[in-house]
Amino acid sequence: MSSIYRTVSRKEKPRRHHGLTTQKKQEIKEAFELFDTDGSGTIDAKELNVAMRALGFEMTEEQINKMIADVDKDGSGAIDFDEFVHMMTAKIGERDTKEELTKAFQIIDLDKNGKISPDDIKRMAKDLGENFTDAEIREMVEEADRDRDGEVNMDEFMRMMRRTAYGGN
């Protein structure tokens, strides 16, 4: 199932560099400077939470602490500008991935009912020159269909694609 989705995603849109735009880099720099309120050159957990909100990310205290721990090389409990840029690049990449998966879902959902049905997969596979049996298509749907309604909704699709792409849940 995942090979069909990856093929569709690649056909629809050429691969693009996931670097940050100049505007995004500037926004990150401004956010860092704005929220480094004491001018120390680092951002602590409280400052990071405010910065993340300003950039459009709502996060729990636990998520903020984990973000700091993931990039805090010296164990100071705060992050410097380079660590902040690295962390924000990853967060923005996650958001881009969700947008790409949403587009892929919409392409595969041929009847535009908000769910991917076995018929959608069969027609898409045929358009791509793939030949799957009904049993193979049913197995693909069952792999992702958590609510067991016989179709794959957006949440199920996202979960399955993330599991496929990242080897986890």
Swiss-Prot record:
GO terms for biological process: abscisic acid-activated signaling pathway involved in stomatal movement. InterPro entries: CALM/Myosin/TropC-like, EF-hand-dom_pair, EF_Hand_1_Ca_BS, EF_hand_dom. It comes from the Eukaryota. Residues 23-58, 59-94, 96-131, 132-167 form the EF-hand domain. It comes from Arabidopsis thaliana. Ca(2+) 1 binds at D36, D38, S40, T42, E47. This is Probable calcium-binding protein CML20. Interacts with TON1A and TON1B. Interacts with SAC3A and SAC3B. Interacts with UCH1 and UCH2. The keyword Metal-binding applies. Residues 1-23 are annotated as: Disordered. SUPFAM superfamilies: EF-hand. It holds the Pfam family EF-hand_7. Induction: By wounding and infection by the bacterial pathogens X.campestris and P.syringae.
